[in-house]
């Protein structure tokens, strides 16, 4: 094996090392990932979160994968920021169906001064229910980050999406360094980080490895690493992107597990398209977190009862809140708003 299964925490991974992990025989890679996983987690427990879109559509960013972008005509109905009481009602529903974390996402480049008081009240209200809280609101400045931390926010999601080299092909309205700066503000404020990326945007193996290197070589590993499979949405520039090979997706999860052994690896956007066998293989590769409920943020997600039925067949138990924590991923939020059920507010992603 090309990396130690003892999985001491490292922050100095090289491209050659990570590519060597990717290209080793599939069974060897999965064995290594499962060995690392068992050294740090109960292999038969998966963390469960629920994700709610608190403000949908009309985002000024031009992310080519995202149906929420105001640059593309995807038929998505725009919505204003939800009222605080509505958010709290949805959080209560999430707790009732077994979620331990409630993740709130807004389609913003960054939160405005007029919206921040409402966002802070949402955090306080959800926290008072005994749920862990997470948000993805776009870029933050230092004052906003500190205000969220003071309100009790546990996790902040801000995805890197892809490698620095490929990033400019996907997004031009926010720089990679701005994303890294937001993550630094979040960490400095004492909150936990959720950050990952998306497969299927035309990136190379070097780009996939490069994304994981960026995450693993941060001063502290993200507590949650969502790995998303592109959900292709009509009207976005990536609607005709080439499909991701399922084995390549599983390899990405396995390498993420090896590089960041103590992080929750979330099986995120795109799970609706995965059959049960692929999801089971994902859990074996080290994925130990999913989003649970009706939807991703704007894309379909397996129904909650189907998730629990699969868990039962695999002998997997939902992770209790006290045991570990994970976080929401923004790519899920940004990743697709295709089958919007008017009667439901939940959006799920999995990782």
UniProtKB/Swiss-Prot annotation:
Enzyme Commission number(s) from the entry: 2.8.1.6
UniProt xrefs under InterPro entries: Aldolase_TIM, BATS_dom, Biotin_synth/BioAB, Biotin_synthase, Elp3/MiaA/NifB-like_rSAM, rSAM
Pathways involved: Cofactor biosynthesis; biotin biosynthesis; biotin from 7,8-diaminononanoate: step 2/2
Gene Ontology process terms (BP): biotin biosynthetic process
The organism's place on the tree of life at top rank: Bacteria
Radical SAM core domain mapped to chain residues: 44-262
Keyword Metal-binding: yes
Needed cofactors: [4Fe-4S] cluster; [2Fe-2S] cluster
Positions bound to [4Fe-4S] cluster: 59, 63, 66
GO MF, any single term: biotin synthase activity
Textual note on the cofactor: Binds 1 [4Fe-4S] cluster. The cluster is coordinated with 3 cysteines and an exchangeable S-adenosyl-L-methionine. Binds 1 [2Fe-2S] cluster. The cluster is coordinated with 3 cysteines and 1 arginine.
Keyword annotations: 2Fe-2S, 4Fe-4S, Biotin biosynthesis, Iron, Iron-sulfur, Metal-binding, S-adenosyl-L-methionine, Transferase
Catalytic activity reported: (4R,5S)-dethiobiotin + (sulfur carrier)-SH + 2 reduced [2Fe-2S]-[ferredoxin] + 2 S-adenosyl-L-methionine = (sulfur carrier)-H + biotin + 2 5'-deoxyadenosine + 2 L-methionine + 2 oxidized [2Fe-2S]-[ferredoxin]
Keyword Aminoacyl-tRNA synthetase: no
UniProt binding sites for [2Fe-2S] cluster: 103, 134, 194, 266
Subunit architecture: Homodimer.
Similarity field: Belongs to the radical SAM superfamily. Biotin synthase family.
Functional description taken from the UniProt entry: Catalyzes the conversion of dethiobiotin (DTB) to biotin by the insertion of a sulfur atom into dethiobiotin via a radical-based mechanism.
Protein name per UniProt: Biotin synthase
Annotated source species: Pseudomonas fluorescens (strain ATCC BAA-477 / NRRL B-23932 / Pf-5)
Lineage of the organism: Bacteria, Pseudomonadati, Pseudomonadota, Gammaproteobacteria, Pseudomonadales
């Amino acid at each position: 094996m090309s990396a130690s299964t003892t999985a001491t925490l490292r922050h100095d991974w090289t491209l050659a090392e990570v590519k060597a992990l990717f290209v080793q025989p599939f069974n060897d890679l999965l064995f290594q990932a499962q060995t690392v996983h068992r050294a740090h987690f109960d292999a038969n427990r998966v963390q469960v979160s629920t994700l709610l879109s608190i403000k949908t559509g009309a985002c000024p960013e031009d992310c080519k994968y995202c149906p929420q972008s105001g640059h593309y005509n995807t038929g998505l109905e725009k919505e204003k920021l939800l009222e605080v009481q509505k958010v709290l009602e949805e959080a209560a529903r999430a707790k009732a169906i077994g979620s331990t974390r409630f993740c709130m996402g807004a389609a913003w480049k960054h939160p405005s001064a007029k919206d921040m008081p409402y966002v802070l009240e949402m955090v306080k209200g959800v926290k008072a229910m005994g749920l862990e809280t997470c948000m993805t609101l776009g870029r933050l400045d230092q004052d906003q980050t500190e205000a969220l931390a003071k309100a009790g926010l546990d996790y902040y999601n801000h995805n890197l999406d892809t490698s620095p080299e490929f990033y400019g092909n996907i997004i031009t309205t926010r720089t990679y360094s701005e994303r890294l700066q937001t993550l630094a503000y979040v960490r400095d404020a004492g909150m936990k980080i959720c950050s990952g990326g998306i497969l299927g945007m035309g990136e190379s193996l070097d780009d996939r490895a490069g994304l994981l290197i960026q995450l693993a070589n941060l001063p502290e590993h993200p507590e949650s690493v969502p790995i998303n499979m592109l959900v292709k949405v009509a009207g976005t520039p990536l609607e005709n992107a080439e499909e991701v090979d399922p084995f390549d997706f599983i390899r990405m999860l396995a390498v993420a597990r090896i590089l960041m052994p103590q992080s929750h690896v979330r099986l995120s956007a795109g799970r609706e398209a995965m059959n049960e066998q692929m999801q089971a293989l994902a859990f074996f590769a080290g994925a130990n977190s999913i989003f649970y409920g009706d939807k991703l943020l704007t894309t379909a997600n397996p129904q909650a009862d189907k998730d629990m039925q699969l868990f039962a067949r695999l002998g997997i138990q939902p992770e209790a809140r006290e045991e570990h924590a994970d976080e929401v991923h923004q790519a899920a939020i940004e990743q697709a708003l295709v089958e919007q059920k008017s009667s439901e507010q939940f959006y799920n992603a999995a990782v």
